[in-house]
From Swiss-Prot:
Gene Ontology biological-process annotations: steroid metabolic process
One GO CC term on file: intracellular membrane-bounded organelle
Gene source species: Gallus gallus
Name of the protein this chain belongs to: D-beta-hydroxybutyrate dehydrogenase, mitochondrial
Transit peptide start-stop: 1-46
Length: 339
């Protein structure tokens, strides 16, 4: 694809983020290019931080990136929701070993309504002043998979949606009363794939598009309540998460092939199937390994007096592609990037 070949060198440029600008540095090339668009929001770049961070509590979900520790260094009281805390597994043990009274792990499965309700009760009862509520909620619990539509089972679609979309909705609804008390923040981790579709990623894209829509609606509703809602749309950071190891990709592919209807296997053939799996392996190995732009985006959304509605921590290649895919006619963007 011509656009991919021409813009591939952009992958070698530093990760782009619209999170924070350093007043001491000159504008980046893309910022200069987009200055007329961004100038109206320029005052937000130098917005101050909220005060009394040390007395504010934040609940974080998803431990694949180290933002509980980063937010802890900012001075927040952290409640880290952990899927397997009761088993002493996963990231909860590492956080507990910090032996900090500001780092508190909580058993929380976003797919279990009763467990979510128990987490709300636990957080509410352990807040220093429950009437002041919970300052922030960071929704990042998620899973992913791959496979073209005809290769993907309905069970897989529902499994991914239950965690990524309904888990976000369920947890947000449960903790909103505490967030409203503090006039605090909701930060939902979406993805660039919540803005543009991608072949072989429909289960994931569907859920992230849903998170985007949910977050927009929530932002409209919460604005009169004084609650600010931000969306973080990371680019390709999959190489530093635990979502896709080579072994996991192979296991998913083998299971998918074994469960395909005979007519689908016959029509597509194993050669085509293996080619798509190989593309996924390449994608998983090509992402950025510096997650600091994502972590800084979350921190800015929680600490700035004027947080952004959307943050775009991603390579310039993906940022440019996202702008083209979302703003140009599909007849053009599809030709450039898909066909």
């Amino acid at each position: 694809m011509l656009a991919t070949k021409l813009s591939r060198p952009l992958l070698n440029l530093p990760v782009k983020t619209l999170t924070v600008k350093n007043p001491g540095n000159s504008f980046r090339p893309v910022q200069r290019f987009c200055f007329p668009l961004l100038s109206s929001c320029g005052s937000r770049s130098y917005a101050s931080e909220v005060d009394q961070i040390g007395s504010r509590a934040v609940l974080t979900l998803g431990l694949d990136l180290p933002w509980p520790k980063h937010l802890h260094t900012k001075g927040f009281i952290i409640y880290a929701g952990c899927l397997q805390k009761n088993k002493g597994e996963g990231g909860s043990k590492d956080l507990d070993n910090m032996n900090s009274d500001r780092m508190r792990t909580v058993q929380l499965n976003v797919c279990d309504s009763k467990e979510v309700d128990r987490a709300v009760e636990h957080v509410n009862s352990s807040l220093e002043d429950p009437e002041k509520g919970l300052w922030g909620l960071v929704n990042n619990a998620g899973i992913s998979t791959f496979g073209e539509v005809e290769f993907t089972s309905m069970d897989t679609y529902m499994e991914v949606a239950e965690v990524n979309l309904w888990g976000t909705v369920r947890t947000t609804k449960a903790f909103l009363p505490l967030i409203r008390r503090s006039k605090g923040r909701v930060v939902n981790i979406s993805s660039m794939m919540g803005r543009m579709g991608s072949p072989a990623r429909s289960p994931y894209c569907i859920t992230k598009f849903g998170v985007e829509a949910f977050s927009d609606c929530l932002r409209y509703e919460m604005q009169p309540q004084g609650v600010m809602v931000s969306i973080v749309e990371p680019g390709n950071f999959i190489a530093v998460t635990n979502l896709y190891s080579p072994e996991r990709i192979k296991a998913i592919a083998d299971k998918m092939w074994d469960e395909l209807p005979e007519i689908v296997r016959k029509d597509y053939g194993r050669k085509y199937f293996d080619e798509q799996v190989s593309k996924m392996e390449t994608y998983c190995n090509s992402g950025s390994t510096d997650t600091s732009p994502v972590i800084e985006s979350v921190a800015h959304a929680l600490t700035s007096t004027a947080p952004y509605t959307r943050y775009h921590p991603m390579d310039y290649y993906w940022w440019l592609r996202m702008q083209i895919m979302t703003h140009m006619p599909a007849a053009i963007s599809d030709r450039l990037y898909v066909y």
